[in-house]
């Protein structure tokens, strides 16, 4: 059975305190008002559990091992420690060479415009209660893990910032939790993409889609269709690249769902 993150009673934040992971930290006791929490100048999601407030913090893949700090209500500083994690390398061959090198002027204009649109989408913050009760968004095979050091045609690129689930073109992609559609678009690298808002900076994104069946501003419930699996953008075959953001930071989506997805 899939479990919401806050229901994982046996999960210690220390076990998740790695680059690309998450930490859950008690930030206030018995206050009726939600505290304002910042990490690296980004708002952090908070949730009340048994009369205590907790912050759910996303750790950047670029974070270094050691002590980190939260700023609570612009006055109190809370420290926590993260440990290092060595993500393995992955080498992929991309047949469309212009998806890796040799971009035209028109390509670069599109890529730059996409960066602006994506940055705007993933910076969204709404005050609605955070919803971490996730299910897997597609029925498929887990084909590429989060955090891998990516090499395209032997050229080093940014680490893999999502979870790849391989499935045939046309396979339904479902909302993992109730949400509001932030935006949709067709991007150079990401292909057809949907962004969802699950509250307080918890966002999710669905890349390389074939068809998109939702519109910006639309409310979706858990299990409702967002579109279908495809192979648009920079891909090696049909799959869903699923991303989850906390405080404007990509984190491992596997932390939000059961660990028994079939793997390679």
Language-model regions, residue ranges each:
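Zn2+-dependent peptidoglycan hydrolase active-site motif and core
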Residues: 176-210, 238, 243
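Cationic-aromatic interfacial patches
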Residues: 7-88
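N-terminal signal peptide c-region/cleavage motif recognized by signal peptidases
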Residues: 2-4
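Surface-exposed, glycine-biased beta-strand/turn segments
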Residues: 79-190
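Short, well-structured beta-strand-loop connectors
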Residues: 172-182, 214-229
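Terminal peptide-recognition signature
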Residues: 41, 70, 142, 165, ...
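Residue-level recognition of beta-strand microenvironments
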Residues: 145, 184-185, 209-212, 229-232
């Amino acid at each position: 059975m899939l479990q919401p993150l806050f229901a994982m009673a046996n999960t210690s934040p220390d076990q998740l305190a790695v680059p690309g992971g998450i930490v859950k930290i008690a930030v206030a006791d018995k206050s009726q008002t939600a505290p304002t929490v910042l990490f690296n100048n980004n708002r952090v999601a908070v949730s009340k559990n048994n009369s205590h407030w907790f912050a759910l913090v996303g750790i950047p893949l670029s974070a270094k091992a050691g002590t980190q700090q939260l700023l609570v209500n612009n006055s109190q500083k809370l420290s926590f420690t993260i440990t290092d994690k060595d993500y393995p390398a992955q080498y992929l061959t991309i047949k469309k060479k212009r998806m890796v090198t040799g971009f035209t002027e028109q390509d670069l204009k599109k890529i730059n415009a996409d960066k602006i649109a994506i940055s705007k989408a993933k910076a969204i913050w709404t005050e609605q209660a955070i919803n971490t009760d996730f299910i897997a968004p597609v029925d498929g095979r887990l084909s590429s893990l989060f955090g891998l050091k990516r090499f395209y045609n032997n050229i080093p690129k940014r680490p893999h910032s999502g979870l790849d689930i391989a499935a045939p073109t046309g396979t339904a992609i479902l909302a993992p939790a109730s949400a509001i559609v932030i935006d949709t678009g067709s991007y150079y690298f990401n292909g057809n993409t949907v962004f969802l808002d699950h509250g307080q900076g918890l966002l999710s994104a669905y890349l390389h889609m074939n068809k998109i069946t939702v519109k910006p501003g639309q409310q979706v419930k858990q299990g409702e269709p967002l579109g279908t699996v495809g192979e648009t953008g920079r891909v090696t075959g049909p799959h869903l690249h699923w991303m989850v953001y906390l405080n404007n930071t990509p984190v491992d989506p596997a932390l939000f769902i059961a660990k028994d997805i079939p793997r390679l």
